[in-house]
């Protein structure tokens, strides 16, 4: 018989120890991975609820199982809040992840062998935008576009490639691009050849919700996003659209279920509903504004310390440090910073001479540290510590000094107070 006082600690000590150690790691390390964030206890409460028990294949009011009257309310709340938050008139909250959302879009609108244009992974794109190692790159004929010598998207190249290859879809969005995307220009290019414009705004969804970054929803045929990252919700995906094309919406729904998924995760959808409500609060906008300010403040320090920032700056929450001139690899930098309790990720840079497993750069993002309460003063100090380590990458004394500074600032700015 199940009892409400059952717990992991008394039953599975090994698992509980790992979970508790991860809790300590998150509190005692500075998180700078651009795709990571801290979700609220309210979201975690939803994810740990009895909703995890319920199968609900189908959509609200059109389920294949009985007993869905309450989860219908949960999902409809998430749908309506997502539409309001992003100015959409269609939302599908069922995708289990951003990658699943993207695959559902492809499933709904493309046939194997169709041509798509996607941002080159080495220039800041994402695996699911046509990388040859991803299913998207195996199923479709992918033509990559990239950035110019200034580090910005080359729209002239994009237009020329579109005209030459006549793709059925142009994919916008990125995983490591610090500039502003001209969604209107991309739609013009797509319209000129009769292609879909599909935008993956996973990295900037929180900034978009707070009007800190341009919203692609009014311009794209379809928009997807994750619900974590800058949006700070549970790990999951979301599909949005606007324009009233009911035929398109039906195709998208079918692309999710039954096209690429079975039963939705109702406990996660409840977490999404909570996160969307939180994103409508005034303090969320203040938070996102600070995310952008903090990223810019860090860039200023790195430039002053002689580091090469790809694109020369940032207009969102992330940026890349190109370490080629420093004769460092991303792998070395990642490991050295990790020893000082600073977590980043190695990342390829444009024209990277190293393999994706080594790389010549690191990606830095500000959402998580901003969630802790860091402002410009703290992130400038942090950027200085990172520079100290990278300037003296084999000096254990510098590493130990910075680690103590990190532990001190983490204690002053806890994740969960």
From Swiss-Prot:
<comment type="pathway">
    <text>Amino-acid biosynthesis; glycine biosynthesis; glycine from L-serine: step 1/1.</text>
</comment>
<dbReference type="InterPro" id="IPR015421">
    <property type="entry name" value="PyrdxlP-dep_Trfase_major"/>
</dbReference>
<comment type="subunit">
    <text>Homodimer.</text>
</comment>
<dbReference type="InterPro" id="IPR015422">
    <property type="entry name" value="PyrdxlP-dep_Trfase_small"/>
</dbReference>
<dbReference type="InterPro" id="IPR015424">
    <property type="entry name" value="PyrdxlP-dep_Trfase"/>
</dbReference>
<dbReference type="InterPro" id="IPR049943">
    <property type="entry name" value="Ser_HO-MeTrfase-like"/>
</dbReference>
<feature type="modified residue" description="N6-(pyridoxal phosphate)lysine">
    <location>
        <position position="229"/>
    </location>
</feature>
<feature type="binding site">
    <location>
        <begin position="125"/>
        <end position="127"/>
    </location>
    <ligand>
        <name>(6S)-5,6,7,8-tetrahydrofolate</name>
    </ligand>
</feature>
<keyword id="KW-0028">Amino-acid biosynthesis</keyword>
<comment type="similarity">
    <text>Belongs to the SHMT family.</text>
</comment>
<protein>
    <recommendedName>
        <fullName>Serine hydroxymethyltransferase</fullName>
        <ecNumber>2.1.2.1</ecNumber>
    </recommendedName>
</protein>
<dbReference type="GO" id="GO:0004372">
    <property type="term" value="F:glycine hydroxymethyltransferase activity"/>
</dbReference>
<feature type="binding site">
    <location>
        <position position="121"/>
    </location>
    <ligand>
        <name>(6S)-5,6,7,8-tetrahydrofolate</name>
    </ligand>
</feature>
<comment type="pathway">
    <text>One-carbon metabolism; tetrahydrofolate interconversion.</text>
</comment>
<comment type="function">
    <text>Catalyzes the reversible interconversion of serine and glycine with tetrahydrofolate (THF) serving as the one-carbon carrier. This reaction serves as the major source of one-carbon groups required for the biosynthesis of purines, thymidylate, methionine, and other important biomolecules. Also exhibits THF-independent aldolase activity toward beta-hydroxyamino acids, producing glycine and aldehydes, via a retro-aldol mechanism.</text>
</comment>
<keyword id="KW-0963">Cytoplasm</keyword>
<dbReference type="InterPro" id="IPR039429">
    <property type="entry name" value="SHMT-like_dom"/>
</dbReference>
<keyword id="KW-0808">Transferase</keyword>
<dbReference type="GO" id="GO:0030170">
    <property type="term" value="F:pyridoxal phosphate binding"/>
</dbReference>
<dbReference type="InterPro" id="IPR001085">
    <property type="entry name" value="Ser_HO-MeTrfase"/>
</dbReference>
<keyword id="KW-0554">One-carbon metabolism</keyword>
<dbReference type="GO" id="GO:0019264">
    <property type="term" value="P:glycine biosynthetic process from serine"/>
</dbReference>
<dbReference type="GO" id="GO:0005829">
    <property type="term" value="C:cytosol"/>
</dbReference>
<feature type="site" description="Plays an important role in substrate specificity">
    <location>
        <position position="228"/>
    </location>
</feature>
<dbReference type="Pfam" id="PF00464">
    <property type="entry name" value="SHMT"/>
</dbReference>
<keyword id="KW-0663">Pyridoxal phosphate</keyword>
<dbReference type="InterPro" id="IPR019798">
    <property type="entry name" value="Ser_HO-MeTrfase_PLP_BS"/>
</dbReference>
<dbReference type="GO" id="GO:0035999">
    <property type="term" value="P:tetrahydrofolate interconversion"/>
</dbReference>
<feature type="binding site">
    <location>
        <begin position="355"/>
        <end position="357"/>
    </location>
    <ligand>
        <name>(6S)-5,6,7,8-tetrahydrofolate</name>
    </ligand>
</feature>
């Amino acid at each position: 018989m199940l009892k409400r006082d059952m717990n992991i600690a008394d039953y599975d000590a090994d698992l509980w120890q790992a979970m508790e150690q991860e809790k300590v790691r998150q509190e005692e390390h500075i998180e700078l991975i651009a795709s990571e964030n801290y979700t609220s206890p309210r979201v975690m409460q939803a994810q740990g609820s009895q909703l995890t028990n319920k199968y609900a294949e189908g959509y609200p009011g059109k389920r294949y199982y009985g007993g869905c009257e309450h989860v219908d309310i949960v999902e409809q709340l998430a749908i309506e809040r997502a539409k309001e938050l992003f100015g959409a008139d269609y939302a599908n909250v069922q995708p289990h992840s951003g990658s699943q959302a993207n695959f559902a879009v492809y499933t709904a609108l493309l046939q194997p062998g169709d041509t798509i244009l996607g941002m080159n992974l080495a220039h800041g794109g994402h695996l699911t935008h046509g990388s040859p190692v991803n299913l998207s790159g195996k199923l479709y004929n992918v033509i990559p576009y990239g950035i110019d010598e200034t580090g910005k998207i080359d729209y002239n190249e994009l237009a020329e490639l579109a005209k030459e290859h006549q793709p059925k879809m142009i994919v916008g969005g990125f995983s490591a691009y610090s500039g502003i995307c001209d969604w209107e220009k991309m739609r013009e290019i797509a319209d000129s050849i009769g292609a879909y414009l599909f935008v993956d705004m996973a990295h900037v969804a929180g900034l978009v919700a707070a009007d800190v970054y341009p919203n692609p929803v009014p311009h794209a045929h379809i928009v997807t996003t994750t619900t974590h990252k800058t949006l700070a919700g549970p790990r999951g995906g979301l599909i949005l659209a606007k324009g009233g094309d009911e035929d398109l919406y039906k195709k998208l729904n079918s692309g999710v279920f039954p096209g690429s998924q079975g039963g939705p995760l109702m406990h996660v959808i409840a977490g999404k509903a909570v996160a969307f409500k939180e994103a409508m609060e005034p303090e969320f906008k203040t938070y996102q504004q600070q995310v952008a300010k903090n990223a810019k403040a860090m860039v200023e320090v790195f430039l002053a310390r002689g580091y090469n920032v790809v694109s020369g700056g940032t207009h969102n929450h992330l940026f890349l440090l190109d370490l080629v001139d420093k004769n460092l690899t991303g792998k070395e930098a990642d490991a050295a910073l990790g020893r000082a309790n600073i977590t980043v990720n190695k990342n390829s840079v444009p024209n990277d001479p190293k393999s994706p497993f080594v790389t010549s750069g690191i990606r830095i993002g500000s959402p998580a540290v901003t969630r802790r309460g860091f402002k410009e003063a703290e992130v400038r100090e942090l950027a200085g510590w990172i520079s100290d380590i990278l300037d003296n990458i084999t000096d254990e004394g510098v590493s130990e000094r910075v680690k103590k500074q990190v532990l001190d600032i983490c204690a002053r700015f806890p994740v969960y107070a």
